Amino acid sequence: YDYITLIGVFEYGESYIRSENPYVDFLRIISKHLKPDGKIILAIENRLGLKYWAGCTEDHFGTLFEGIQGYPKTKGVKTFSRKEFNGILEEAGNLKADWYYPYPDYKFPMTIHSDRHLPASGELHMRDYNFDRLRLDLFQESQVYNTLLSNDLYPQFANSFLLVIGKEQPQTAPVYVKFSNERDQKLSIYTEISEAADGQLTVKKVPSQKNAAAHVRNLGTICEELTGMYKEEEIEVNRCRIKGDCAQLEYLTGITLEDKLDHLLEEGRTEELEKLFFSYIQKVKNIHEKKPFEKTPEFVRVFGNVNLRSDLKCTEISNIDFVPANIILSENKVSVIDYEWTFEFPVPSQFLVYRMIFYYLELNDKRGILKERDFYEKAGILPEDIEVYVEMEHNFQQYILGEHTAMRNMYAQISPGRVEVEDYYREKKQESLEMLQIFWDNGKSFNEADSVRYLFRNGKIQTEFEL
């Protein structure tokens, strides 16, 4: 065979292969049926996946910590760490593998990283993916992921593995895939980063459905239009070339504006952070405030017939995705790397500024300290404006979904939810500080030396006195 797939299958090996090394024998048997250049595609949970440390139950048995404790109470199903799996590959005939890491897991992957393209700091921030069982919430996974990434430990603690296995080392071109398919079919795409034989990386946006091809091809036109608009602020646009139904873009290197701001925040340089952030807010205003804003039918179709101020300004073309995560800073230039959500009709510049602030300030808890600096107010955005922009953003997200029902929107209806352990801990800690203090009278009125304290246990105290 050219390909053999083992998707959520390999872990059951010891249930039906009766041998001393069932998982090794499993791969030995399967690999005999491959062509010389054939591949095994294997997807499986990582026994040491971070989600299990954070309070998700083991996928097959539904119990807490079963896998990370080495399956002390169960038999018949086993998952493996990366080190353990490498040992199995070697014993099974020195098989070679290309390693990929689906996130949040291989069942509902939204991104797939690899050793050649690991996640960036702050990229892994999904919380609501336990659709089948109740989970504990022991810590903020996003912040722990950042710690693992900075210590080169992510491959050991990724939630799932996707392996391309062969008798020779597989040469797999994609190094990263992001799925944007929780959308209306006409907008459903995926983004792929591939590596050529010479090591050069390229980015490609591909329609997931045939009727999304027009959406992808339109990126070529948008690129040309934005290039002229952004030139006045010395901002470059990631070059786009349309090839068939795909959009091919440059792979740009550097640091995102988001990461730059985060570094300043971590160093306590908040004044410098604010100055840098607002320099880009001013660029947006300079580019997008060319004429008074008036609603168009196209605007209402996407953002709704909202009640906007009369003094807003705009341009004919509006890139609402000009947010810090999409701006790359390199030594000698500033570039916009993603401009998919550019509309060829006017959108108020203030909404673009609102999105810049919101998508930086509100999506990471560590940035909460910046809220006291009143970025919205300093940008001229009033509380009543925010209410309207929240409605616009909601309508925009509904436009993207169309008739599609996203899994994330069904979480509240499907999932048993989560138990917030920190809240429980704080509650119990507060109880531990609540004490009953009893004084006895030695003729000195209230005297701390003549007293005893008792801790409440489950809201009660029981004690005895010898009289």
Q: What residue spans do the PLM features occupy?
A:
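Catalytic activation segment of kinase domains across protein kinase-like and atypical kinase folds
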Residues: 61-72, 299-368
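ATP-binding glycine-rich loop module of kinase domains
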Residues: 178-225, 260
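A short glycine-rich, Lys/Arg-flanked "PGG" loop and its adjoining helix->strand segment in the class I
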Residues: 19-39
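Conserved class I S-adenosyl-L-methionine
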Residues: 41-64
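Conserved structural core of kinase catalytic domains
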Residues: 236-303
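C-lobe/activation-segment region of protein kinase-like
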Residues: 335-425
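Rossmann-like AdoMet/SAM-dependent catalytic core
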Residues: 84, 98-193
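Short alpha-helix
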Residues: 75-101
